[in-house]
């Protein structure tokens, strides 16, 4: 006797901890081999075949039987009869060209078993074609029996498998064990799976009326895998993860065979217990550790009488069996195997209610369908299709971001050229051209990173975008902070200390920021292991997905440190911008520009930081747009004012110091000749009108790239300061009756008049300020050198024209080289006041600039002078007080 069995899929070895073959098919194979051996049928007479394969699967044995037992004599007679009948129908078989028919003829099959109800039509046709062939079909359709009522062959058998009992038991036990009172279920889109879902939930409600059910429907094409763009394993992982997020602690399914194996494997990875059902045989090691219970059915107990009758050549009428309802537990010998973690109280509860559960199954009207329940008790989470729509970045957005970034890169290159061209102009030199170049280079890095970001998702782009954007922002922010930190140190200097900070001294700070950023990015790359992964904008529906970069937990920690690092740099920059608000020179005061730039960065970082960590959809477009805005805002805020100032003020700048600085080179060349020639009134006038205070000289030579240039600029600036002081010394040391004093009068000036023997004074109101002053007989009013009296009309006596005494080392003469004569030591006479002092007339603009430039430095000294003047007016020693006042002004 030869048996032929049909099944859909075979089970492979090696699943789940050296798990043996399991599943309904394999269980039936083992049981069938066992009972046939007991009946004396050799194993090589049993053949298992997969209908989905074109060739027979010789999983077990060859078809040739060389050694027949004595018990097979009757079988041989039956085989001969079958062969005769089959030969009579050979013409009909050849016309059908059915591989099943060929196998039956070639292998001389006596009995064929179909495992699935979907092949009921094949079983019915074969039974009608081969009248002497015993045909058995196991009906796994829990809705109804197979439509084989018109089959008159008395060797056709139908066995109804009790799926409902197993499913109801799974639901009953799940309701007892669940701690959250929320259970999950996964089913396919088959009609019978909906019935299994109803049965599962009905069993759970029998044991726990408060339980809730959440389920997904998996719409997967198992026959044509090419119709699916998503692997079945990933779909199960998505659905299981979503159920766990909703508070589910137990999950069951209607999957079978390989699909059930995949489902169990995923549950084990999530550390979720497996609910065995549907007769799956699981090895004891797995059962003890991971499976809550098994319900195993021995189908061969019902098949055994059929095979025995076939061996004994006894025909049994199966009409009563064909239309039978599902067999009960006693007929299939159900065995429940529980996990040791389940308490004895639950086990006793199940065993005591097992008969009640069977009676509920036999009466289908007691089962409540899911569509009859309210939404509070059962929740349909939707359908997960095997073909999930992939939504990449829109081509319009990709092209738009790429084009905009490319245009901005071109604009930055043009700005870079302008910086190099106009680096010596006040608007750019005052802003440190070296660091302006760093800012522009950083912006180019960011835009290149944005272009790579939207070009696609792979391992390279996931890492490159982090490196380029992060290093670009560090270079930009570092350049802004460091260059303004120097301005703060120079201008926030009340005591006017000499501070020299060159670009070479600042570059290590920018380099340090850059290297620290490289270190953090290395940690992100090494620990994060950025790889592409699929993101679902709608976590519950899973209708579409995007591909983004996934980062491991170690990389996320380094990313948090990187974001904190940027926050610290930005806060320092905001503080520095607040400190340099005191600078009253437009080219140096970038407080508003820096503040606005950093505020825009803070605003965008508050949006970018959460999106960088999250896995939501469409964050690529938001992040790229944010980075484009940050760089564009910084470049616009920092450079538009500089180009505007270049257009308005040109090469001279907005302040007198830049005009002085531009002409200081030519003045230094003629320094020796002009300072040694007191008769050169023009050079003396220019020196005396120099409006550069010490505060200006502190930063005129500080914005250089090397120490040598800084030293040269420093010495020249100091020379200018000494040069200005020499003018004061020369004017104050000229004697009233000397030739030098007489030469200082403007003889060619038509407004000049010779003084009389006695000076004639006019009221201060007759010569309004700032009328050009001349040292005629008319005294000066409201000036630091004008003789003061109580009513401001009486001329000051013994004023600054009184010669200095022995406190000066060498007395000056007309040419400033001859020692002073003895006449210097004689006291001043009244007539000496008649000799006028002459200064070069000053225009209102020059006088205004001089007063504004000197006022920050001399403000405190003027107060001291006024106080001293009041004391001098009541003092008897007017000569000594005048010398003290002149010395304080010169200092």
UniProtKB/Swiss-Prot annotation:
Ranges facing Cytoplasmic side: 421-433, 483-505, 577-592, 647-891
Gene Ontology biological process terms, A to Z: G protein-coupled receptor signaling pathway
Residues of this chain annotated as glycosylated in UniProt: 52, 85, 88, 125, 132, 224, 298, 312, 320, 325, 353, 363, 375
Membrane topology term: Multi-pass membrane protein
TM stretches of this protein: 400-420, 434-454, 462-482, 506-526, 556-576, 593-613, 626-646
PROSITE patterns reported for this sequence: G_PROTEIN_RECEP_F3_4 (PS50259)
MF terms (GO), sorted A to Z: G protein-coupled receptor activity
Compartments (UniProt record): Membrane
Chain residue ranges for the region called Disordered: 52-91, 660-689, 742-827, 869-891
Primary residence: membrane
Extracellular face of the membrane: 1-399, 455-461, 527-555, 614-625
Bias type Acidic residues, positions: 872-881
One GO cellular component term noted in the UniProt record for this chain: plasma membrane
Keywords: G-protein coupled receptor, Glycoprotein, Membrane, Receptor, Transducer, Transmembrane, Transmembrane helix
Record's keyword annotation contains Membrane: yes
Low complexity composition bias: residue spans: 772-782, 882-891
Skewed-composition ranges (Polar residues): 742-767, 783-820
UniProt entry tagged with the keyword Glycoprotein: yes
Family listed: Belongs to the G-protein coupled receptor 3 family. GABA-B receptor subfamily.
PANTHER family: METABOTROPIC GLUTAMATE RECEPTOR-LIKE PROTEIN C-RELATED-RELATED, METABOTROPIC GLUTAMATE RECEPTOR-LIKE PROTEIN N
Name of the protein in question: Metabotropic glutamate receptor-like protein N
UniProt organism field: Dictyostelium discoideum
